[in-house]
Amino acid sequence: MARYAIDLAPLRKSKDFSLLWAAGLISYFGSMITYVAVPFQIKELTGSYVAVAISGLVEILPLIIFGLYGGVLADALDRKKLIWVTELLSLLFTAILLINSMMDSPSLLLIYIVSGLFAATSGLRQPAMQAALPRLVDHEDMTAAAALMSLRWQIGVIVGPAIGGILISTYSVAVGYAADIATFVISIVLIAFMKNIPPSHEAEAPSLSALIDGVKYAFSRKDLLGTYLIDLAAMFFAMPTALIPF
């Protein structure tokens, strides 16, 4: 049975990986609370399935565009600082949702705009998170580190919405947003204790041409293009955003 156990070696060996993993887990809990809170609030405001579904649609284009550019930035900038800044931006966006939820007449348009901004920051953050791993763990621990990052996501996607549902149904949407803000504060503090992860000396400055080259390369590789299309289809057709509040 030991061979089926989770390899925790990267967490034991690398303090910086442990900080990144813990920060990501905690902030993802909060993000999943907001993932529940946003459609619930839209349902309360409109009572419409379509209005709830639109909150998911507005995330697709920013996620794709900024996900591509996030890869360029992750190659050219300090990855720790990039992750830290995107966490801070996510905190600010959640604060906007919190303030909006406490208004007498919350703005539906503002919720849609912030949902798109969340997707953009997520697109910027994920490539930096992935690119940071080889600089934080030994080569022989890369597989275990990738598995732990996947485990972090699985825990968050299961536990986070459950916590969000309890908080929102017991208290309010505002409490859910406040809980998310608290998780981002913790995450930002943990990331601040990580070492810097500067780009290599050969890294080029981020540019539109680098982004275009990356897109051309992705389209030239059928294996990569297939994984992108599968991920996009799963996000577009399998995420139950419109069903959560009903």
Predicted regions and their residues:
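Alpha-helical transmembrane-bundle signature of multi-pass membrane transport and export proteins
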Residues: 1-246
